[in-house]
Amino acid sequence: MNNYKLQAPYQPNGDQPKAIKKLVQGVNSGEEFQTLLGATGTGKTFTIANVIQQTGRPALILAHNKTLAAQLCNELRQFFPKNAVEYFISYYDYYQPEAYVPVSDTYIAKTASINEEIDMLRHSATRSLFERKDVIVVASISCIYGLGIPSEYLKAAVKFAVGESIDLRSSLRALVDNQYTRNDTEITRGRFRIKGDVLEIGPAYEDRLIRIELFGDEIEAIRFVDPLTGEILESLDQVSVYPAKHFVTPKERLDSAISAIRNELKEQLDKFAYEGKLLEAQRLEQRTKYDLEMLREVGYCNGVENYARHLAGREEGTPPECLIDYFPKDWLLVVDESHVTCPQLHAMYNGDQARKKVLIDHGFRLPSAADNRPLKCEEFWEKSRQTLFISATPGQWELDQCEGKFIEQVIRPTGVLDPIIDVRPSDGQIDDLLSEIRVRAKKNQRVLVTTLTKRMAEDLTDFLSDNKVRVRYLHSEIHSIERIEIIQDLRLGEYDVLVGVNLLREGLDLPEVSLVAILDADKEGFLRAERSLIQTIGRAARHVEGVALLYADNFTESMKRAISETDRRRTIQKKYNQINGITPKPAGKKIENSILSFLELSRKLDTGGLSKDLINIVSNKTDDILNAKDNQCLLDEMPSLIDKLENKMKDAAKELNFEEAANLRDRIKKLRQKLSRNT
């Protein structure tokens, strides 16, 4: 049964109906690989949403970074508000992997900081995959890393049903075995408490509490309740409480794992002794024996993931089970921006193994640590059954899987044509660019400029700034959150020009950009290859007056192919518009605060130095501000404010001031609603 309910204020048009029909036919007929070659701004996400809705398959959408994953997740949640659209990325705010540098004899211990909200979203994704069919998971490449054993995770779930009799002591023990901790004072995710005949659990995948009310040994009621006020939110007939961690190891398997680790240790020590590596042997023996003692006593140790092969009972060299293994058999894989995502996917294993080999060779880890790894590319494709590659510039590998066939989508619903390409000589290019920027600035339009080196970008930024141009410089050292802010400021008109080395960022959605300038376009290389040029030119493809300026003294083969492809698309688009009487119109798109930006901004932004409006909100003077015309400054600071109010709400609840906590909760709810309306 197809439970997907697609909601959109418009119907497929342009090339979308044809692309949707062909993709659906391919999926239903069992085609293993298909490629959608969709030009920038043609509505590829909406096309994929329709394919998912019509095929009714659970879907994994793979993006090559968490920012794009968040953008996709937001869009799909708007299309499928009644279905489960989940977000699965690495839950580390900060991660420094364990490493050893032999040249300087430097050991670097693993350090990491886990984002609890993202961890909750990851658990929500796996819970949804177990409990329903209408599930779309938008994930980053982190989904190819080990994620426990799905069968053990499901088997370990503690089930409760109204009317059933339970042994409370056994249920509490099961929760502890599933890595929940008892705390009768403060309950949060991964904790539970028991008061009289009421058991309350903070599940790993919810921000609500599960309250189980008992009458003797019989379950009288099961409810979702607000963790701060105790307000009943929903009544249930039954509920499954999944483990607090994805890695679940039964007692019998832990015992056999300890035995296997001990045997492997003996073999490796004998090997080191034979090779005369006495220091390495001592180092390995000391560390591993300590880890074994910790595993025996508490079932956990630092770096426990390095023993994952033994704890999972896998054979040497076999692939780990990951998010993909939580999907049912008939799932659908969608690889977004496949020309970037596929190479990234194929490179993950080799990079991981190079680091692990050094640790193993120098006695920091057992050889089995090498099996705590991402999937190899061939293992990944063996697990996937049907795949849709999505890109404006598909790579050769993807096209080879489809035997060179692809489905094209070049008509934009807005009727906007691909940018006009204007090739100009490099002599006097900076003065020429400055005059073009001033023309756009007067029209309240934006400009992107891409250079070949950081030094050139810095010098150009300084020159433009000295000439009274509002300009910013985007480079690799800027944190991803600051990058989001810079892009939002460009759209808001805080400045007119963005300069960078590599602005071809796939998925960068900037409808206000009318001019893209590519300096040194005739210098062959990665940044001026055909695909890079097409992607960069495409940044101006959402504007009615879109133009791409290529400064070059020669026509390279890459330039010729990129110009030819752009002209071909313009011809098709222009003809379609003439036949159908379509006048190009701007692609108006609201400025978004993505899931990712909201999560990280709410955690990281300084809550000090709030604006007057925000001070009024903290002082409970919210109604006038919330009902007033949108204040962008307020919107920008809102995630920080929500974080501040949540802390005040928790403090009020701890002090048993539930009336104040409820009042703060309602204000936070208003703020979240305002934020969602304007994103």
Swiss-Prot record:
GO terms for cellular component: cytoplasm; excinuclease repair complex. GO terms for molecular function: ATP binding; ATP hydrolysis activity; DNA binding; excinuclease ABC activity. The keyword Membrane does not apply. It comes from the Bacteria. A motif (Beta-hairpin) lies at residues 91-114. Pfam families: Helicase_C, ResIII, UVR, UvrB, UvrB_inter. CDD domains: DEXHc_UvrB (cd17916), SF2_C_UvrB (cd18790). The keyword Ubl conjugation does not apply. Residues 25-412 form the Helicase ATP-binding domain. Residues 639-674 form the UVR domain. Residues 429-583 form the Helicase C-terminal domain. SUPFAM superfamilies: C-terminal UvrC-binding domain of UvrB, P-loop containing nucleoside triphosphate hydrolases. InterPro entries: Helicase/UvrB_N (IPR006935), Helicase_ATP-bd (IPR014001), Helicase_C-like (IPR001650), P-loop_NTPase (IPR027417), UVR_dom (IPR001943), UVR_dom_sf (IPR036876), UvrB (IPR004807), UvrB_inter (IPR041471). SMART domains: DEXDc, HELICc. It is found in: Cytoplasm. Forms a heterotetramer with UvrA during the search for lesions. Interacts with UvrC in an incision complex. The UvrABC repair system catalyzes the recognition and processing of DNA lesions. A damage recognition complex composed of 2 UvrA and 2 UvrB subunits scans DNA for abnormalities. Upon binding of the UvrA(2)B(2) complex to a putative damaged site, the DNA wraps around one UvrB monomer. DNA wrap is dependent on ATP binding by UvrB and probably causes local melting of the DNA helix, facilitating insertion of UvrB beta-hairpin between the DNA strands. Then UvrB probes one DNA strand for the presence of a lesion. This is UvrABC system protein B. It comes from Prochlorococcus marinus subsp. pastoris (strain CCMP1986 / NIES-2087 / MED4). The lineage of its organism: Bacteria, Bacillati, Cyanobacteriota, Cyanophyceae, Synechococcales.
